[in-house]
Amino acid sequence: VLGFVVHELAHKYVAIKRGFFAEFMFDTRWALISLLTTFLPFKLLATGYVAIIGNVGPRDSGKIAAAGPTTNILISLVSLSAFRALSSFYGYSIVNTFLLTVAYVNAYLALFNMLPIPPLDGSKVLGWSMKNWAYLFIASVILLILSVYI
């Protein structure tokens, strides 16, 4: 939940910084889909989205879209780094398990959102910059692998 909230707040923050009005919109369809995935091996947490009001071109749209996955990548990276630092002192503890879970969930959120399928963030980032899309996609894949096999 933390990763989802920070992800959406990042979209809103960047949109406002770029001069647009942004508001979180609750979407009952996505909330229902999220609820249904609790019974599946993979989870989807998407109860809404940030609606951006204004004339948003591909560059602005891509930068706003990149903010969410970038935040998830940073949270995953910080959590993995903290896990590595603490595990060398304390071994496997509940704190380390929590940090590894946070790293995994945020890497998963970043990777899922970077899929180049509309309406996901990846399609907007790719429409703006293939290079930036590749950086974010590869970073999320690497972090997901590290969080599983560390």
Residue ranges and their predicted role:
Residues 1-150:
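Hydrophobic transmembrane alpha-helices and their immediate loop junctions
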